[in-house]
């Protein structure tokens, strides 16, 4: 079982007087910066010119170029998209790190897969809240917190663990609990969850169910409701209390169908395929493929995305959601 740390386990003064640079001001960046500031950390924000720059300034932060922020900071937290981190690190962060600094991430992808190679004389750790930035911020302001993971990759100063816990405490995570892990474990489990279950697995299952009903002659609108729309109701029940809460809450007919039909859909063959997915994550095959795809301009990514956006389930869904303004997205979806 994971070791869990709380507020009482933190050396609160280990980052006292240290300057923290938050590189990036998106979902996680704004939450980290604001929570740290509210906990009396000395925070600056490092960005390239754009909307985020203006937003950070509006929120009252001193904003600098990434290079300037990295040069003045003792702790540099990189909260950029995975695919952008290596370029920004090599161009603007690496040469500005000083001995004894801390280089921090919220996901281990680039360090674990050797896209970022930190100097040997800096501490390297990750602090990864297990929730989106808006939730990290909202729960903090309400006196609560989102749990987080932390891991130490390199302990150059002998105090990397203490710094990681102090940072986690600064964003409020120790109120809920901070679980110790490794860069390898965090990266590989995160990627597996996304690919086999949360994104890849669920979308493939939803589409397969929809197509099965439509191919059998059922109206696509009903297929959409049964295989996609109602998924949120079930996931919310699991989120609140696990599988047992979902099974307690649905009808006995639905629960019996779960027991007798679920194992026929997700079979041992499915688990073997999941094992293959995990192996490709572990041996770096997935990372190499994604890095190459990004460097080539993402031709397959964009082609698949465009095709998926025109699947019948999406066409029908867009029409049905016009009937349900309460589920309309708050942000633009579709092409990236």
Curated annotation (Swiss-Prot):
Keywords linked to the UniProt accession: Amino-acid biosynthesis, Branched-chain amino acid biosynthesis, Magnesium, Metal-binding, NADP, Oxidoreductase
Molecular functions per Gene Ontology: ketol-acid reductoisomerase activity; magnesium ion binding; NADP binding
Amino-acid positions noted as binding substrate in the UniProt annotation, renumbered to this chain: 251
Pfam family, any one: KARI_N
PANTHER family: KETOL-ACID REDUCTOISOMERASE, MITOCHONDRIAL (PTHR21371:SF1)
Domain KARI N-terminal Rossmann: 2-181
Protein name: Ketol-acid reductoisomerase (NADP(+))
Organism for this UniProt entry: Bacillus cytotoxicus (strain DSM 22905 / CIP 110041 / 391-98 / NVH 391-98)
Catalytic residue list: 107
Residues annotated as domain KARI C-terminal knotted: 182-327
Record InterPro entries: 6-PGluconate_DH-like_C_sf, KARI, KARI_C, KARI_N, KARI_prok, NAD(P)-bd_dom_sf
Pathway assigned in UniProt: Amino-acid biosynthesis; L-isoleucine biosynthesis; L-isoleucine from 2-oxobutanoate: step 2/4; Amino-acid biosynthesis; L-valine biosynthesis; L-valine from pyruvate: step 2/4
Reactions accelerated catalytically: (2R)-2,3-dihydroxy-3-methylbutanoate + NADP(+) = (2S)-2-acetolactate + NADPH + H(+); (2R,3R)-2,3-dihydroxy-3-methylpentanoate + NADP(+) = (S)-2-ethyl-2-hydroxy-3-oxobutanoate + NADPH + H(+)
One of the protein's GO biological processes: isoleucine biosynthetic process
